[in-house]
Amino acid sequence: MAALFAISQNRYQVVISEIMADPSPIVGLPNNEWIELKNTGNTAINLAGWRLGDLTGTSGPMPNFILEPDSYVIVCTGSAVAALSAFGTVISVTSFPSLDNDGDQIFLRAVNGTTMHAVNYQSSWYNNELKKEGGWTLEMIDPLQPCAGKENWNASNHQNGGTPGAVNSINGTLNNTTALTAIHAYANSSNMVNIVFNQPVDSSSGAAIGNYSISNNSVTQAITLAPLFNQVQLTLAQPLTEESLHTITINNINNCKGQVMPAQQVKTGLASVCNTGDVIINEILFRPRPNGYDYVEIYNNSKKNIDLSKLSLSNRNTSGSIANIKTISTTPLLLYPGDFVVLTENADNLSLNYLVKHPDKVVVMTTLPSYPNTAGNVVILNEQGEVVDELAYTNKWHFPLIDNDEGIALERIDPNQPTQNSSNWHSAASTAGYGTPTYQNSQHKLFETVKGNITIMPKVFSPDGDGFDDIASIHYTLPETGFVANITIFDAAGRIVKSLVRNGTTSTSGYWNWNGLDDKNKALPIGTYVVFAEFFNLQGKKHSYKSTIVLARRL
């Protein structure tokens, strides 16, 4: 009697269960790339005509082969069959995809074109610095939870470096409690919006237009996108316009296990070209703690929706040329007006060292440009290679009383003041954990144009690093340009304690910051101080102003 096998298959009945992307250096398996498939169902499957693929192409069809229930098969290129046959059942395909060591998106497609399973693996999934260098496989933990993503994968524990054609060495039941969530949305044209989820969604619920509504517009079509099924593409009745925001409300969407996502909202909008000053550098950690990572926080200081996949992060080499250009995001990701995003190489490490109030505002880049501990350049470029913002920083900008700046971020004080103004940067407050990634800086202050000649804000300040009134700002307004300034600070006895500015050039308005230190960079005692400001020009005009300020400290 002929064996029964399924003609029509359910998605995830056959899954990708093990990946050998980097076989060298050899641990105990042949020096060949391969993918292992497992039949998780209770019906045999004929793999004839099935194909594997990645972002660069699709393999030739698989041969006539019956994959029995709860069994495995190794798929590879023809030249690897002999070497891998010693470990299990092997079939070959032409044009076997070249598996990238750092990560790739691979998929399994049935003869009828249905995507049965897809994996967007990354080298970070090994969770082991040694094993990710080669010779070890990535194994799926629980084949009955094929949608769980990185939580369901880890490096093999087998002494050979993998378990081709056999039960995985880390096989087990995954206690996955991660709920389906809409991460973000972006417009890929004026009338199409993609919603990105954290895991695959059920195709039928994802394609029901009644499950979506959008402010000041309506949805005419919804499509769940293969091969990962973690995006839904909406077609809109009316085209979107630039510099407008819309809210998408999502209801009744299921994940691949049938769990319903609670009602949720995400923002979206049409991206605009990013010009100079639209996105600014807002915070930088260039000397992390041991085993830590640099980070750069950027801020959208415009009314535009900015696509981070069109921006790059870079530095300058010793000759002063732009170098080490790194694209911020490999996929569309919008930065909305007034929003922050933090760029780093390791989100988990960032959360271990700092309070990350908005984890969804962390973008993990494979590598950041080098930002040395003492001085360097942070450069943001747009799609045309134009400089959007640049900071030439130095560790001398840290608060002078800090003995060790390791793990302390430099924060921008006012987003509307020039990036390169050293007075516009200050060490992050100790009470904020020495860094504020993904939210407003501890030293944040907006300077507004004030009436009068000099104004000191605040009138009482306490330079103790707690993030509250650590800096005194001496703000001036002048009737015309062309003046030179001298700012001198006296104690109550009339002695000069700080020559804050000497022959400083001015505009019609501006400011200088004082951190409470004297000319020898020593902390001054509490008390009342007099700020004396002189402004003069080459035509002999002169303006003199005097004001007082109180320096306070915690008792």
Region locations from a protein language model:
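Signature of Gram-negative chaperone-usher
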Residues: 144, 170, 496-500
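Bacterial N-terminal signal peptides
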Residues: 1-3
